Amino acid sequence: MNVLDTIYQLMMSGSIVGLFIQVVPITCLVGVIYAICRYNKIKKQGCSAMWGTEIMRLLFVCYLTGLINLVLVPNNLWTYIWFYLRNGYSGCEIAPLFSGGFNLVPTFLKYHTGEFTIGRWVRTMLVGNLVMFVPMGFFLPFVSKKINPRNIFAFGILTPIVVEVLQPIIGRSFDIDDVIMNFVGIIVGYFIAVGVKALIKKA
């Protein structure tokens, strides 16, 4: 088995790592297009670029591209795309629009009342949803001067809510656990960025 076969099997595994690898190519493509367009714009304007900020913006664009493809496209879309590219089209079973479900009761309440057991998969999903949005909170202070301690909490709660409201439309599910963990991830990322910026100023 060669390297490409190994990567393909990992992509088709349905694991978090596999889903991440599925969107790496489109993320890199968008990043390259953005970098070229941004470079040409700066060159045309004849202004000096703050390369630290520009790199942060590029990384943020790549991150957003990956995030959108992970949470705002129908389930299994990229799985079928990669299967088609490798094996040819054989039909697909993407969830129909407006077919998602709703979970409005947080897992910790279900666990507290004894109606739910937090297994390994649930813990992985909870931690994954937190970690997935840490870069969002981290990049924002570097790419936007409008983000501050007064509005980061509003942004942190509104963004996950918007994402979750859209998910049932594309056949996914609204999950209050995702809203909570995404919010925590954004706030954690923001304060990590605040700490990093403070260290940079002292250096």
Q: Residue spans of the language-model regions?
A:
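Non-cytosolic membrane-interface motifs at loop->transmembrane helix junctions
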Residues: 83, 173-184
